[in-house]
Amino acid sequence: MSEKDSYMVFSGTSTRSLAEKICQSLGCELGQLVITKFSDGEFAVSYEESIRGRDIFLVQSTFPNSDNLMELLLMIDAAKRASARTINAVIPYFGWARQDRKDKPRVSIGAKLVADLLSVAGIDRLITMDLHADQIQGFFDVPVDHLYASGVILPYLQSLKLDDLVIASPDVGGSKRANTYAKYLGCPLVLCNKTRARANVVSSMQIIGDVKDKNVVIIDDMVDTAGTITKAADIMKEAGAKTVRACASHCVMSGPASERVQNSSLEEIVFTDSIPYSNRCAKVKQISVADMFAETIRRVINNESISSQYLV
């Protein structure tokens, strides 16, 4: 069996465009999979070609969370029952990752539950990108290949050739990620210290560092309602920043996010295509991570190291 015959790539409904680009990069066809939806809201998964003895790669971001997660679980179960040799879940955006610990009494740890569900369903490996918390890798008993969007975002930032560049973190929790970018680009780091009134609502924010006459790039792992990142951009502009941009791995962009970004001080906000973005906001740009995932899949198939893919 040749290398191309040894593996197959399939996609759920949430990330089909990215899966097609991954297959184009790999030089293979996207596998035939039918998802039948019923009037009561249930759905069934069926592989339309033999996958017996093959290494299967299932591409599916779990956003919006519940239906796409259930769809992925059924894809895994069907592959296991169809005698696939290995089942590799390729989850560019891992939903529920913000529920990685008990931050108050009597709450669930959603990320651990999702990890357990995927494991019980039958995955042999997880390939994902920029988990909200790195320690989620430890929730799995199977190998986890954790990729970083810096592999495509850093080259983009370098192409802008911005002088007086400053990297910013929108909160203290993201300082490690932002500091990695700052070190690679050889520029200063500034932080924002925020206080939340409740979930998705920022009550106050202060800048720690100098942004006057600087070109600021805010780095984050995801943008949800865009309240934090747009508030940070507006405050930095008021503090004298020349320009403010933002880069984030995952384009959740729910609720009022698009309107907030459009009306903010941001020059642009750059995401990967881990989540498709359909709203039209002139300030939103997406960079594909298809080649990065394709190369990872190729290396997994050939039992090669993937560490050389990481810029930082």
Where are each of the predicted segments found?
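PRPP-associated nucleotide enzymes
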Residues: M1-V312
